[in-house]
Amino acid sequence: MNPLIRRFNPADEYYFEEGCYIHELSNSPDDPLMSAARARLPLGGQTRWHRLHNVVERYLIEAGEGVVELGGQAPQRVSAGDVVVIPAGCPQRIRCIGEQPLVFLAICTPRFEPDCYEDLDT
């Protein structure tokens, strides 16, 4: 791996089948140990129940308010500054409950790849 700076381009945001908008900040085979994405849930939006196999995920809440559900735990409110740690294989979903979109960084180790994603709502 060589040193580099990945530039942010708002136009790179896309809608992901999970139910939120994603902007991949860093996700490359050249850096297999970690990926970072900016996720955005619109007002009232909610992700599908899902889990990531062999990947630990962390949500770093940047803006808005939400309710996160993890495995069999009771739903918990989250807001700016909170960090949610999601073990590999743990069922999860998050919902925007505030008056503005819920924005968070999703940090995955190792990096997120489509094959690790399992939709549990199907």
Can you name each region flagged by the protein language model?
Residues M1-M34, R48, C116-T122:
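A short, N-terminal "cap"/entry segment at the start of jelly-roll beta-barrel domains
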Residues I22-E24, A36-R40, R58, P75, ...:
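Conserved hydrophobic/aromatic beta-strand scaffold that supports enzyme active sites
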Residues D30, P75, A80, A88-P114:
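Ligand-binding loop in jelly-roll beta-barrel domains
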Residues L33-S35, V55, P101-L102:
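A structure-centric signal for secondary-structure junctions around beta-strands
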Residues R40, V56, D119-T122:
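Short intrinsically disordered coil segments
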Residues Q46, L52-A80, C90:
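A short beta-strand-loop-beta hairpin characteristic of the jelly-roll/cupin
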